Design a protein with these regions (language model features):
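Short linear clamp-binding motif
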Residues: 1-9
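Active-site neighborhood of HAD-like aspartate-dependent phosphohydrolases
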Residues: 8-58, 159
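Acidic, Mg2+-coordinating phosphoryl-transfer loop and its flanking beta/alpha structural elements
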Residues: 134-169
Length: 173
């Protein structure tokens, strides 16, 4: 299968794969918000304690800041009617509703293109019913590897410039 960036002809918007974009640490800064809510670095806090503190922080999810470069990335992909594909937390009953509120406040992604799933289910969005591949932009390499293994095109998000270059190489302008 030829990749879009290998084609010499001009690629139309309709020929491009659908974009599925993660939220946490791609668009919004979960770690910054979590560190503040927990009162210490999230990764060092006791697992049960940290999630209890997040659950008890009113407006935690919808109050997250943009991740550095997140607005720039969203502005670029917004032209292509992206989907949001984000894992909800099974440890915080507020995460689904809060993520939806964050998206409504900060983006124009319609509810029908927002998929809040268990982390391990992201790979189910790798290909469409017709077999065409989708793109996943995600900071977690395990998600990228699983998505690629199912026939998708994973972009491991480590910084916005790199992600935008990879999208442009795939034909997005």
């Amino acid at each position: 299968m030829k990749l879009l960036y290998e084609l010499d002809e001009k690629v139309s918007k309709d020929d491009l794969p659908d974009i599925y974009c993660d939220m946490d640490m791609v668009l919004c800064d979960f770690m910054k918000g979590a560190d503040k809510a927990v009162g210490e670095p999230f990764i060092y806090a006791d697992r049960e304690t940290r999630w209890k503190k997040i659950s008890n922080t009113k407006g935690f999810w919808e109050g997250l800041d943009w991740y550095p470069g997140g607005k720039r990335l969203y502005s670029f992909i917004a032209k292509y009617d992206p989907h949001i594909l984000s894992a909800y937390s099974t440890k915080d009953a507020n995460s689904r509703r809060g993520k939806l509120k964050w998206l409504a406040k900060n983006t124009k992604v319609p509810r029908g293109k927002t998929h809040l799933v268990l982390r391990e289910d992201k790979q189910k969005y790798a290909v469409n019913r017709d077999g065409s591949s989708n793109i996943l932009i995600d900071d977690y390499i395990k998600n990228i590897n699983e998505f690629n293994a199912k026939g998708g095109i994973g972009i491991h998000h480590t910084d916005t410039g790199k992600t935008l270059r990879e999208l442009k190489n795939l034909g997005f302008k």
